[in-house]
Amino acid sequence: MHPTIKFILASLIILPAIAAADGLAAVADLKGCTNAAITGTAKLKEQVTPEGVKEVTVELKMKGLPDGKHAVHIHEVGACEPCSAAGGHHDPGPAGQSRPDSAMDTMPATDINHPFHMGDLINLDVKNGVGTFKHTTNRVTLAPGRLSLFDADGSAIVVHTQPDTYCDEESELKKGCAGGTREACGVIRLVK
């Protein structure tokens, strides 16, 4: 068979599969864990690069947070009541680690393997009580698969009280380096 015909036939099979994943969208309505004045919305949109890599753009808008930088992470369970129900950072796969192991039992679950969790995002900078960011990651997907946010128990977005220092203090893990206490949480829901 001619190489051009092979290419066209392969494209007819591959491109619809890529296009099917492109355009998926999700949303999360965030509420303060202990302060009802804290509210926000996260919009997530999946797109596929020309190389076929799935990326998710996260747009976050928050109100009512104290000024300064706040860690933002995608957590492994789609539950926010209480905020601790969201579990650890989203980190599926054979090398994933969202829970403490016996050698590190003095560290919080979210600090283990940090900043290499799939759900680790950038810090949110809040000024005059308002913070926004737009961040694209290829560490998670909305479509089904190993990195999907929509596994059996879903996922949530959590905003923390402190900035994420990415636990990179001279290659040593320090308690709280992943952002400290949970300030706000929202369950991620697929909308398209």
What are these regions, as identified by a protein language model?
Residues 8-16:
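Bacterial N-terminal signal peptides
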